[in-house]
Amino acid sequence: ETDTLKAGGSAVDAAIAANAALGLMEPTGNGIGGDLFAIVWDPKTQKLYGLNGSGRSPSGQTLAQLREKLGDATSLPAYGPLPVTIPGTVDAWFELHDRFGKRTMAENLAPTVRYAREGHPVAPVIAMYLDRSLAAYSRREDEFDFSNARKVWFADGSAPEAGDIFRNPDLANTLETIGREGRDAFYEGALAETMVTYLQRQGSAFTRADFAAHDSEWVDPACATYRDGFELCELPPNSQGFAALQMVNILKNVDLAQWERGSPEAMHYMTEAKRLAYEDVARFYADPDFSPTPMDLLSERYGRERFALIDPAKATAYGPGEPKLEGEGDTTYLTVVDGEGMMVSLIQSNYRGMGGGLVPDGLGFMFQDRGELYSLDPAHPNAYAPSKRPFQTIIPAFVKKDGAPYMTLGLMGGGMQPQGHVQVLVNIVDYGMNLQEAGDAA
């Protein structure tokens, strides 16, 4: 990303370049088969912009049809064709680039194309996760066709070892096509045809029209004021970002700094705030196109009501609250700031492990398995439905102080991400830690 900045690229250009490289070098956490969320601070307008780059389910498959495919299963699997949703990352790249980019997309992707052709050393932690992925997929080879993944990452029957030079010429060709032909090559052109043909062969209900219809959504980040002028900003559902804001609105009602960090008292309030917020996550967070989000979840009044339920002496059993519908918004995270002050907070993931194990013919990447998070209960806000985005765990964040940009924030960890965001914020605001200390202690 530093080379991209030195060449005159913006923070968004550098973020795209870095994300592409991570998809090659850390395929166990992210890649162009997954989804992307981002928050951008634009120094020209002095505003935050949010992007929801998550994909949808097949338009022609109903919940009843899905349940018929699942048989006696009570939830969606993590592997195979059924948990696949449209990959949103590539479209999100172009949305970000069209608004904030300076270099061409081909220039942004060129370093990763080169690394994919010439090879790169495999990091120890990636070697470990690749080995785990091989074991997980091998156990399920009677359930779905794992052969394309074997060709890309496990050609000799084993996972690459730490220090091995790994090459992925198929991914190089795919990225080169995207850079040369643009977004439509992936969602409407030959790449889309390859993906849909492969998915249908595996038993998926996706069509060419589903891919052509995909689009990212620009959204307004919402912010909650903590104390001392600090604001935490997150993206709205179908992500879980609002859970962090709910925790902030609960915790602002108690002075955590009166106790030492990590003390039983402080940890009790942190834990109870998380539990209260997560009850609402399970009840209210879903694709707002299907289930409107009660914006009252973010009101200070609602935060006070939830805080009042906490017993300072013991853990308490909670249920979801009753917010008003109208109010009084495995993973790799990266952040880039350029010389003009543009700041990018970007998170991207294939969801569980490398994804669902399916690799389209000759394209060098794996489809995500995010659809595992759909509920099969038709009454649930996150119930599976045609053309619906599933609940998302990945959330970028942004922190302002006295209205000015202060820092970007994000981390891996699935469902604990809102909790992690709040822990970092509390460590900085209440316990005076610097950024490194706050992250290490969280």
Identify the residue ranges that each predicted region occupies.
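Noncatalytic scaffold domains of N-terminal-nucleophile
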Residues: 3-7, 11-181, 186-188, 193-239, ...
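Active-site rim segments in enzyme catalytic domains, especially the processed small/beta chain
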Residues: 24-28, 35-52, 67, 205-207, ...
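A short acidic/small-residue loop/turn micro-motif
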Residues: 56, 351-353, 413-414
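Feature for intrinsically disordered/low-complexity regulatory segments and propeptides
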Residues: 171, 421-424
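Short, small/polar residue-rich loop motifs at catalytic or cofactor-binding pockets
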Residues: 218, 328-331, 392-394
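Extended C-terminal regions of large enzymes
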Residues: 234-237, 399-416
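Internal maturation/activation junctions in enzymes
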Residues: 253-350, 363, 370
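Compact, glycine/acidic-enriched structural inserts
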Residues: 308-311, 428-442
